[in-house]
Amino acid sequence: MSNRAEKKRFQQDLAADVNHLCQRAFESLVIVHNGRQGAGAGMIWHQDGTIVTNYHVVRKSSLRISTLDGSEYTAEIIDRQKKHDLALLKIETGEELVPAPLADSRQLRVGQFALAIGHPWGQVNSVTAGIITSLGSIPLRWHRGAVDVIRTDAGLAPGNSGGPLLDARGQVIGINTMIMGGDLGVAIPIHVVNDFAARKIDQDHAR
């Protein structure tokens, strides 16, 4: 087999692998419509209709959610936190939803494969790939103190905000939140998101 044929075969296999990895996550990916500001991404966190997205995506109180099958729902903001740029939404669908599969972001290492999914520039269910370039705490423009983040070279654009960052198994390792330096994506680690979301869900289910 020639080098050109080998390269083509590798690209085809890689594309098939990436598509397979993303399918489960796409089931949990939503579009967050926030009026005139446009749209961001979000992720089904719990089967009861709880959704995680970015704080900056939901500054408007009038929100609509579109799911993978094209259904639309009115969303209620049930909690938000500016420090980590996180927000929890709730939709009522009358049926159980498919929550995203989660990884343990505390086990991540620099150099690992990463996939960002979302709706950049209105392109629904788009995927970009890269690696984790650094891990650690950095100051963010909306918070004076340092915040734990994942930085990757997987391309982000408006419409990726609030969408998941996946590992090589298709599990969520973070929530994409901003672009830094023009070419690095920044995500909030999923263990930080879990601490934020779990408290609210546990409180609601305890009532």
Regions found by a protein language model. Give the residues of each.
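Short conserved beta-strand and strand-loop elements enriched in small hydrophobics
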Residues: 32, 62-68, 114-118
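Gly/Ser-enriched beta-turn/beta-hairpin loop segments
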Residues: 23-24, 78-85, 135-150, 199-204
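Flexible, gly/ser-rich surface segments that form the specificity/activation loops bordering the active-site cleft
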Residues: 100-105, 109-147, 157-160, 177-185
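Short, well-ordered loop/turn sites that connect or cap secondary structure elements
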Residues: 45-46, 57-59, 102, 108, ...
